[in-house]
């Protein structure tokens, strides 16, 4: 939101406070989208916050407090003025640059977000002092680290405290990437080397024959390939706090989540002579899954072009167009017909975790959108390993975090330690375009702007022919294309030019 910034006198501020709501005339064209403002009286920081309810053109017949007597252009209606903790000019930006000096008037944007303001208020003065000291030294500390330092500051003493902050600053400086460093190849090396030690295996859920989860190298390949459907999609579903210890509610949710098709609870018999399909429900299976005959009838009634009859506890279905092909198609359609549950959730099991007897539901199959709509499910903790589905339901930032978490977890389960920043770089590259793209010829590598880089990866002839037809120009800005033509790459020392400046000749 745009804010109006201006420099004023204590006399004018006192006049505004006395006459609230006050009309204030200025020699500046104020935009109509301004809703608040900040006033400085010392040219160093803003000490007053102003609520503006309206902006209109100046008219001489309006009685208003004036900042200057000549060249008046706008009248601001000021509803409220409050004194605030001094705000630095550095918290405002004008035209993409940080505000450094206050002229007469400026329209600027405040950089502090609501979230930062909300959580920043909860910090103690000691923690805030540590954060400020760190910023003064040129680096930023996480709040958790600042809290630990503030807690032990008295124990260490002031001299040790300053030395520790100095050492932290030096360590952070050492960890920063060097200018023009080839971060991509280092990330590839750092992930690829441990990746060679990963096993090709699938994890099996103990005691549940149908449930498997792909881990190791196959899972890592799935992640970087951005597979639309993972080989073993699964969900971890948490219930709301009021339900997660209630056994009856948990079992009810499990049964409502599982996708129950007709083939799960009934035998399907095809009579070629009579051209009919008979559905014979199994009483034990229907009781276990809380299925009534009425539920099966309702599911079958959704099929068009059939005649349905119920006879002695079984359902007889006949296609209106009598043919063997129609009969076969009808049989296959009935097998996969959903009676109840959520589509895509093939299996669900509940497990007790932790000392507090809290239930967590694990599923084979995934359908994040529909699961989050179940009343008892906690949408803030429920998770799926289907990254593309996360992108479709929760957005690209959630998908970026999912790529990072899934890759990190896959490596850690194999006992491999990879710096998270390498994985963050991969996640950023896969999602920066706004959609999840694979690391391969169909994704990042196949969509590079360089013709030679695309051709060097895969399908060389196609890329070169298409580039020739379209008249593409390669500016040789990347790594692969410069290596191909035998030029130094524009990274590291190849990114800068060295100019020799000799010493001037001295007169003898």
Curated annotation (Swiss-Prot):
> Which EC number(s) does the record attach to this protein?
2.7.7.6
Q: Which reaction does it catalyse?
A: RNA(n) + a ribonucleoside 5'-triphosphate = RNA(n+1) + diphosphate
Q: Does the keyword Transmembrane apply?
A: no
Q: Which InterPro entries match?
A: DNA-dir_RpoC_beta_prime, RNA_pol_Rpb1_5, RPO1C
Q: Which GO terms describe its cellular component?
A: cytoplasm; DNA-directed RNA polymerase complex
Q: Where is this region: Unknown?
A: 1-123
Location of this chain's protein in the cell:
Cytoplasm
Q: Which residues form the signal peptide?
A: none
Sorted alphabetically, the keyword list is: Cytoplasm, DNA-binding, DNA-directed RNA polymerase, Nucleotidyltransferase, Transcription, Transferase
In alphabetical order, the GO MF annotations are: DNA binding; DNA-directed RNA polymerase activity
Q: Which SUPFAM superfamilies match?
A: beta and beta-prime subunits of DNA dependent RNA-polymerase (SSF64484)
**One GO BP:** DNA-templated transcription
Q: Where is this region: DNA-directed RNA polymerase subunit Rpo1C?
A: 124-508
Looking up HAMAP family in the UniProt record yields: RNApol_arch_Rpo1C (MF_00411)
Q: What is the purpose of this protein?
A: DNA-dependent RNA polymerase (RNAP) catalyzes the transcription of DNA into RNA using the four ribonucleoside triphosphates as substrates. Forms part of the jaw domain.
Q: What family name appears in the similarity comment?
A: Belongs to the RNA polymerase beta' chain family.
Q: State how it assembles.
A: Part of the RNA polymerase complex.
Name it: DNA-directed RNA polymerase subunit Rpo1C
Q: Which organism is it from?
A: Thermoplasma acidophilum (strain ATCC 25905 / DSM 1728 / JCM 9062 / NBRC 15155 / AMRC-C165)
